[in-house]
Amino acid sequence: MGLIFYRLEYYIAWARYLSNPRVNCFRGEKITTHEEDISEAKKKSEDDSHIAVLLNDDENLIGELFYFYEEPDTYSIGWNFNEQYEGRGYAGESAKALFQYLFNEKRARRLYAYVEDDNYRSQKLCEKLGMRKEGCFLEFISFIKDENGIPKYENTFQYALLKKEWEKQQI
């Protein structure tokens, strides 16, 4: 498995799993046209905040990691993987590589992730990575609307990890 910064040519594989997002927070990224595919992939390839997860370095995109910088030394992180590759450890392995990159290369002090209360796989992954559950924000954000057009709000957990906690785990 390899991690590289997102490149425009990954748009076909990326669009394949975003054409039917399973987690509401990615519904806003749902791709419906080829033009949207290319436009979104181009945005993701413009900086290093989106990282492609490739299976066996063979250009087979199986997921992505992403981060957003918050001054002075904090990063919001996340991931999205093709359903076909779940349960094989790829998300954990690649997230560890992302943590190493952010703590060592970007000099992060703190990482955090928002996870919806019904996204059990991501909750479990955060815990395996040594992240602490810091709290639950009730009706925190809306990604979708119900059949009447009323926003459906998500309960969202926040997980976090400090660099010093990460370093203790690596011993």
Region roles according to the model:
Residues 1-21, 54-171:
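Acyl-donor (CoA/ACP) binding surface of acyl/acetyltransferases
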Residues 41-53, 63:
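A short helix-loop-beta-strand connector motif used in the catalytic cores of GNAT acetyltransferases and
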